[in-house]
Every structure is written in C-alpha cells, then in structure tokens.
C-alpha cells in the first residue's frame, strides 16, 4: 500500500521542512500490511469482479479514536490495537508532589527497540518518561531514548540516538484520544488532515437550532466480531425492533415495511446518507455512523443522535465508541427507553447522582443483546465464502438476501466497502482468526473493566465492602449474646453474597434471547 499521494507531495515537503525546523522528527513508515489490497471490488450480475483502483480509500491515512480520556489512568500505559497495529498509549506529564501534570497523550508501537518487550507492560515514571519493564530503558514523549542504563557513559549518547521508539501522531478531540496510523508523515502534517468528528458538535446543520446535551462515550468496549459487521449493525435500525426487545423495541409489534431513500450518494471520502420512516442514517469514512431515530419505539423521537465510531482494531475485533447527543428541550422519561437512557447518561445529565461506572455496567444490557448475533454472523459470512479482501470471495449479495428498503443502509455500506475501499481493512498483521467458540463474547473484565479507571476503582471498593461484610459474619459468631448473633450474621452474610453477585457484572454479563420474553 502506498502512503503518499502525488498531489500532496509539495505540501508534505513543506511540512517536513517545518517539522525539522521545529526539532520534530518525521515518523517512519510502518511495515507494509501483509494483506494490503491494490484492487477494489464491484458487484456485477451478482458476482464479485476485481477492478483497478489506483485511488482506493487509504485506511492508514485517516484519524481514528482509540480510547476515552475520562476513563484512562494517566499514571500508567494503555495497550490498544488499531488496523492490526499493536500500540501503547501513555501520558508524558511529569508528577510533582503527587500531582500529575496534564502532559500529552502519546502513541508508540508496543515494542521496545531493545529486545521487543511490550511497552504496555512498562511504567510511566515521575519525570514523564515511559520505562520498559524488561530492562529499564526509558523514552520521552517524542520517542527518543532518554536513558539507557547499561551503556558506558562514553557511548551512552550515541546508543540512545539509535534507540528511538516508533511513534504515531496523536490528538485529543471530543473527549477521546485519536491516533493517525501512518508513521510516514510528521505530526504537524497529520494535523492538517481533519478528523471525522461528530459535525453536530462543531458544525451544526443549516437552520438547525439545537441545544445538545452530550455524553462522550460511556466506556471503552472491545467485541470479538468483525468491525464491518458492527458498522452494518449501526446502519440497521430495524434490528432494534427484534434484537433489542424489551429495551429499545418490541419484536412482535414494531417490525413493519419501513421505507428508506438515499439522500447523499455513495462516495469514497463522503460516505453516504439515508432518510426514512425510522429516522436518518449517515456513514462518515472510515468508521463513523450517525443515527437520528425518528419513530415511536426509540427514545427522544427526532431529538437524539447516536454517533458510533466502529474502530477496526484487529481481524475479528472492534472497539465501538458511542457518543450520545440529546436536545435539552426534549421531554424526559416518557417511555421505558428514555428512562433507561437516563440511567445510561446519568453522569452527564444528573451529575453527582449516578456514578460513571454504573452507566458503563448498565450499557452492557443493550450491548450484549447484540454480542452473540454479531459474533456468529461474522463467522457465518466467512463460512459462506464472503471474505472481500481475498481473491475469489463471493459478493455480499450472493450470501445475503435483502429485498427490503429497511436494509438500504447495509447495502450502501457494502457498496462503499467494495467499490471504494478495497473490500475492507488491509490489516497490518496476520488475519487468521482464533477457533470459533474459543472467545468469551460476554466477557466484561478484559473487554472493559480492567482498563477503565472508573470501573476498576468501583470494583476494588465493592471488594472491600464485601470483605467487611464477610468479616461481620465472623464477628457476629463471636458475640457473647446468642440473641442477636443469628440475625446479625445472616444479614452480614446476605450483604456479602449480594455484593459479590453484583461484582460479577464487572467480570461477565451473559444475555440469552431465548429467555428474553
């Protein structure tokens, strides 16, 4: 895959010279993705046909949100994946007197130049450097080696110059850390490329006068399904009726012949837009979907925006980051869905009343209604022969039957993917998947809790409360008076068991459609 476009050559040269003048080091180009595509796919008579696409969508030439600042502990490194790249995020602010300075969020390749140990297992030191836990080498925010303790003093400076980390441009916008996954250009040049931000927050539609209340992503979640099936899911409002029965729809009364029409045609950089009976849909490349629901089963009819970044992390994995916008003037709590969303949005709309960790846990009720469906759907598509980045793949229309208007968003997205984007992400890693059924699709600990500062703190506090309650059982057994011993002991035991059961929601939450009456 090429990372340079001829028309940008002069601009990039100017930016590189400017970067050098400011003492910045241009980023090195990453290794070529193992599955890089140089063709796009179009559908002709139901068959996949490869055609030359010299200006196909460049997946590595765009900004992606990868984490939520509010849930990140700046005193430790955070492992993330993007397009098959293994990265580590960390904050280079110094700590003085126990107070961490604001600093900047940095993104390095999660691999120490010394012996390729994972930097995500390292430490952020008080001086704002990242220390590799394997041998103690340190790196500053630019990626330069700031300390190489094993080198003789006479050679240390020369050794350090040859030991820089591979770094990627970053920025913070709309409460999220964004990464530009192309080391071939400088950070300054990357910032010249606009990030696909939610336009309602920065450039409202003409004539629209909305006072948006905003909930930045409720929490980071990783799902073991294809990122493209997650995009497809967010472009499919009809699934709310059945898949989210009891929360966002009714499988028996809501399905009907909903109509949709295209309001903005599919294009490489512009994506597409649709409008219909269930609201409006917009796809913004590379991975943003915006849905404005406008039918009775969904909350805040016509006054809500669900903006979801379906971040492609690795083959068979996706990190959805959803920003929710609600018009402040919209009435509150008239339907079950609105009351449920009030809990989800509580830390923003009712500050101080609902802790942030509760919104994270509560959101799994809706998210896990999709989990098994998307995991199995992604594997079924592969089993049916749909692998659009590989030669000989069937077309989407060959493996799926979509005769109705309500699937128009999915059809438009698959057309964009095939015609303009080489069929999908050219992963920077091997695209082999783990055996089917080997992943825990209802996991909460590794998918969220372990790297969310709010939920991790809450889990630890609940653990302390549980242990105190368990200790009270022992104390009750030692009471000299037998009369209060039994009720006190039983109450303490019930409390300890109840807390432990609730803590299970931080570890795993399983959902069954069979049992969802």
Language model features: what each stretch is:
Residues 1-27:
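N-terminal chloroplast transit peptides
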Residues 7, 101-104, 161-164, 348-358:
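Glycine-rich, flexible loop segments associated with nucleotide phosphate handling
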Residues 7-10, 22, 34, 38, ...:
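Intrinsically disordered, low-complexity polyampholyte segments enriched for Lys and acidic residues
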Residues 37-47, 51, 57, 67-206, ...:
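Rieske [2Fe-2S] iron-sulfur-binding domain
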Residues 55-60, 344-345:
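Short, positively charged
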Residues 62, 85, 166, 304-306:
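Short beta-strand or tight-loop elements
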Residues 96, 185-517:
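C-terminal catalytic domain of Rieske-type non-heme iron oxygenases
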